[in-house]
Amino acid sequence: MSGRPVELSTLKGQWLLLSVAGGACDAACENNLYLQRQLREGLGKDKDRLDWVWLVSDDARLPEALLPALGQATVLRVPPAVLADWLAPAAGQALTEHLYVVDPMGHWMMRFPAGLDKAGAGRAKRDLERLMRASASWDQAGR
């Protein structure tokens, strides 16, 4: 959150686990950020192949108490119209209710169900592990 504009294309070249929320970050946002961190850490040696990204969809100030927990996350402000052109929620859901997986080419290829709980997070972890195994030969760690 350096204040400098950043193009979404700079995120290419790495698997991404994205969440979208306003800067005020309500309880659902905090839960998604927690799950993103846990899912990434749960990948063990493959965690460096997956970036944890929070896309902030408004100009609200981020809660000071949340900043220390975001040390390994990439946090970017992105206009809502840009997000709507790139990501798509399930029918009847909001963009902010899902976690999204984006491939190294910059295409979102998977979203996890809205309101992910611990049981759902276990299934999501298995999906991410399969994805990392399947892409191991053509993906490189780090950007």
List the predicted regions and their residue ranges.
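N-terminal "domain-start" segment that seeds a small globular fold
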Residues: 1-9
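A mature extracytoplasmic/lumenal domain signature
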Residues: 12, 21, 56-58, 79, ...
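Sec/Tat-exported extracytoplasmic proteins
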Residues: 19, 40-47, 87, 128, ...
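Short, internal strand/loop/helix patches
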Residues: 51-102
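Thiol-/selenol-based redox modules, centered on thioredoxin-like
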Residues: 95-143
